[in-house]
Every structure is written in C-alpha cells, then in structure tokens.
Amino acid sequence: MTERSLNNLILASSSKRRIALLKQINIEPGLILPADIDEAPLKKELPKDYSIRMAKSKAEKIQSSNPNYFVLGVDTVVACGRRILLKAENVEQAEKCIRLLSGRRHRVYTSVCLLTPDQSKQHIRTVVTIVKFKRLSEQEIKYYLASEEWKNRAGGCNIQGLAGVFVLFLRGSYSSVIGLPLHETYCLLSNYFNFNLY
C-alpha cells in the first residue's frame, strides 16, 4: 500500500484537545475543517450508534467538498445508561448533567471514522470507557459550575481540569475520554500514511 503525506489528511474538527492529541503522536493533518452538522440524536438512538453516526456524518460532510482527501471524523458521547448527555448549552443543563453523574458510573463512547478519497473505503472504530465519579458535595458542584469548564464538553465533563478530582476510577482509554483514542487512531492512519512516532 502506498504511504502518503499527512498533507492529504483533513481533520473534521476544530477541537483543540483532538489537535493536541494528534500532535502528541506526531500527526499534523494538512487541513483542519470543522463540520457543521445536525447533532440532534434520533428518537431512541443508543449512545454508541449516535457516536458512530456523528463521526461518520462529520467526515462525510467535509469530504463532500474535498473528495480527493482522506478525512478523519471523531465524536465523543457521554452516556448514563441509555441516556445521551449532550454538550451543555447553559449552566442549568450543566448542573443537570453533573448531578446525574455524581456518585455513578457512566460510559464515554468515542468513535473515529476515516474516509479514503471518494469514500472508496470507510473505517470506523469505537472505544467505550467506563468512568465513575465520586459523590459530589453541593460545594463541589457549585465550584465546578462557576469554573465554566463544562462549556463545550460532552456531558459537561472536563477530566483534564477540575472534574479530574471527581474520578474514582476509569476503565478503558483516557485519551478517548479527552476526545481521541490514540491507539485506534494510530492503527487506522498508519495503514495509509507515513509518519514516525519518534
């Protein structure tokens, strides 16, 4: 298989966390283009299915206007049971999320979709990570909400910041919870691109 330059790769996201995670393994896409798509879940859609659909939709949206590129779409979903916790749009929604997760296990689904040029091939990987938060005090909830770290975060959670102290245990991929499963992403891209980890 011909190895290509990373200039032929588009990341369908403007997430600073995902860009930083890719740089961590020496991957710098040629282009970074956020995909504007409808992110509303379908009726009775399960969290894993939603994550896959979003990652695929982001990649397809960007590739529709850039057909000669490889496109990487990624989506992270926080779920409590079958309930999908979307990005909080205001402090009231953030409070509902953080109270729901307090003292409970939840799952974080991150799906990665790699489309080859003209969508000739489609590769999808989904990583599921189980996270349990401690039971939060009213003061902890108050301080976390005041920090505004919940903004633009799936489920209002930012375990790279203050919410990191809420985590009793994490079973799975830490990088996936942040926004990109590094192992799975590396395996997908190394089939097509020439880059060095060291």
Curated annotation (Swiss-Prot):
Kindly list the places in or outside the cell where this protein is found, as annotated in its UniProt entry. Cytoplasm
Key word Magnesium present: no
Sorted alphabetically, the Gene Ontology BP terms of this entry are:
nucleotide metabolic process
| Record-linked InterPro entries | ITPase-like_fam, Maf-like
Named cofactor requirement(s): a divalent metal cation
The answer to whether UniProt assigns keyword Transport to this entry is: no
What cellular component terms from Gene Ontology apply here?
A: cytoplasm
* Annotated catalysed reactions: dTTP + H2O = dTMP + diphosphate + H(+); UTP + H2O = UMP + diphosphate + H(+)
Gene Ontology terms for molecular function: dTTP diphosphatase activity; UTP diphosphatase activity
Site feature Important for substrate specificity, where: 17, 76, 160
Query: Sorted alphabetically, which keywords does the UniProt record give?
Result: Cytoplasm, Hydrolase, Nucleotide metabolism
> Where this protein primarily resides, as one coarse class?
cytoplasm
HAMAP family attached here? Answer: Maf
Q: Give the record's family classification.
A: Belongs to the Maf family. YhdE subfamily.
Describe the function of this protein. Answer: Nucleoside triphosphate pyrophosphatase that hydrolyzes dTTP and UTP. May have a dual role in cell division arrest and in preventing the incorporation of modified nucleotides into cellular nucleic acids.
User: What is the name of the protein in this document?
Assistant: dTTP/UTP pyrophosphatase
